[in-house]
C-alpha cells in the first residue's frame, strides 16, 4: 500500500492494496449517506466492481444504500459490453440496482482537435442511422436532465444524477502525473483521507499500480475485455486504453484494432468521417508516435521553428492556450531542450482536448527550472 506524506512524497506501508481498499469501504459505508458506484467497463472499474461486490456479499446490510451506474459510450468493443452485462447480472443477484445509461453524453474528439472541444455525442438522435451499435433494450435511453444532446459529459451527468450520494470511482494516481497531483492535493487538504460528504468522489483503489490491477484480475479470475491483449500488441503496456474511441489516447489504434472485428471499421468511419486519419497517419506525430531517428535526435527537424509556424497559422479556436504555452516556452527558452520543443509541437499539432499533455509539459518545464 502507498501513503502520501506531507502531500509531497510517497512511502510504502506494510498493508496490501486489497486490504487497504476494504478498509476504505468500511469507512465509506459507515457514513450516513447512500453510495453510488460508477463503472466504465475498463480494467480499473472491473477491479473496483469486483471489490465492491465482494464487500456487499459479506455486508448485506449495505445493499439498500448502493446503486451502480454504467455509462455506455456507444462506440465500445463487444467484450466491454459482455463484461458489463455480466456485472449487471451479478448486481441483480444481490438485489442492487444497476443503471445502464445510454444517454447522449458529449465526448472529446481528436479528429476535430482544432476546435479543442467535446464535439462527439454518444447515441446522438440526429445520427441514429449511423450509430456504431444499438444500446440494450433495458438501457436508459432518455432522461430529463438532457434538454438537448451533448448537454453534459458523463462526469457532469453522473454528478447530477447522484447528487446527495457518495460517489465511488476507479481512479488511480498511477495513471498520470495530473491524477497523482490532484489526488495529492485532495488528500493533503482533507487530512490524509478523502472527506466523506454527499456528492464527494471517493477513490478506493487510488494507490493501485498497473501490476496490482492485472494481478488482481488474474488471481480472482475476473472476466476482462480481451481487446486489451490486442491493444498491448499494438501500443505496449503504457497505452492500454479502450474507452472513448475518438480521444487522442485511443483513436490512433482504431484502424489496427478494427482488423480484429469484421465490419467495425466501416461503422466507425460512417459515424465519424474523419476517422480515416487514424488509418493514414497512425505512425506519424499526428498521433504522437515518434520514429527512431526522431528519438535519437537525427530526425533533422527544428521543432522550435515548427511550433512558431503552427502558431502563426492562426487556425486555433483557443489561441490563448497556445499563446500561453508558447509564452512559457519562449520566456524560458534557455531551459527548453529539443525533447521539450518536440513535446510542445506534438501538443499543438495532435491536439490536447483534456489538456493533460499541456499540464505534463508545464510540469517538465518547471522541473527544469528547479534543477
State the predicted function of each range.
Residues 1-36, 43-371:
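Nucleotide-activated chemistry modules centered on ATP-dependent adenylation/adenylyltransferase
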